[in-house]
Amino acid sequence: MDPVDPKLEPWNHPGSQPTTPCNKCYCKVCCWHCQVCFLNKGLGISYGRKKRRPRRGTPQGSKDHQNPVPKQPLPITSGNPTGSEKPKKEVASKTETDPLD
């Protein structure tokens, strides 16, 4: 290695800067242009600020998406609404009649 002038900053050392400027091309050659291009283009890592995407406007035909829900009749259930008491009585009578001893 050649001796480097200690007065030079590290980013100004010979060979630290590529001879051609960076571009926006994503081909294989440009991905290996420099370390920054490799991180951004090759690996997809960028540490810069991300641009905000503008929100999409509402379509002209819609009105705030506030369509009311149509009223639907309640479902009619068949049977006893209070529940069946018959099985309870049967269970109670069976337990009383069975001798345990």
Curated annotation (Swiss-Prot):
- Region described as Interaction with the host capping enzyme RNGTT: spans on this chain: 49-86
Pfam families tied to this protein: Tat
**Where is the region Core?**
38-48
Keyword terms, alphabetized? Acetylation, Activator, AIDS, Apoptosis, Host cytoplasm, Host nucleus, Host-virus interaction, Inhibition of host innate immune response by virus, Inhibition of host interferon signaling pathway by virus, Interferon antiviral system evasion, Isopeptide bond, Metal-binding, Methylation, Modulation of host chromatin by virus, Modulation of host PP1 activity by virus, Phosphoprotein, RNA-binding, Secreted, Transcription, Transcription regulation, Ubl conjugation, Viral immunoevasion, Zinc
**Covalent cross-link site, Glycyl lysine isopeptide (Lys-Gly) (interchain with G-Cter in ubiquitin):** 71
Q: Where does Zn(2+) 1 bind?
A: 22, 33-34, 37
Q: What does this protein do?
A: Transcriptional activator that increases RNA Pol II processivity, thereby increasing the level of full-length viral transcripts. Recognizes a hairpin structure at the 5'-LTR of the nascent viral mRNAs referred to as the transactivation responsive RNA element (TAR) and recruits the cyclin T1-CDK9 complex (P-TEFb complex) that will in turn hyperphosphorylate the RNA polymerase II to allow efficient elongation. The CDK9 component of P-TEFb and other Tat-activated kinases hyperphosphorylate the C-terminus of RNA Pol II that becomes stabilized and much more processive.
The family line of this record is: Belongs to the lentiviruses Tat family.
Other facts: HIV-1 lineages are divided in three main groups, M (for Major), O (for Outlier), and N (for New, or Non-M, Non-O). The vast majority of strains found worldwide belong to the group M. Group O seems to be endemic to and largely confined to Cameroon and neighboring countries in West Central Africa, where these viruses represent a small minority of HIV-1 strains. The group N is represented by a limited number of isolates from Cameroonian persons. The group M is further subdivided in 9 clades or subtypes (A to D, F to H, J and K).
**Record's domain comment?**
The cell attachment site mediates the interaction with ITGAV/ITGB3 and ITGA5/ITGB1 integrins, leading to vascular cell migration and invasion. This interaction also provides endothelial cells with the adhesion signal they require to grow in response to mitogens. The Cys-rich region may bind 2 zinc ions. This region is involved in binding to KAT5.
Q: What is this protein called?
A: Protein Tat
Taxonomic source organism: Human immunodeficiency virus type 1 group M subtype G (isolate 92NG083) (HIV-1)
The upper taxonomy is: Viruses, Riboviria, Pararnavirae, Artverviricota, Revtraviricetes
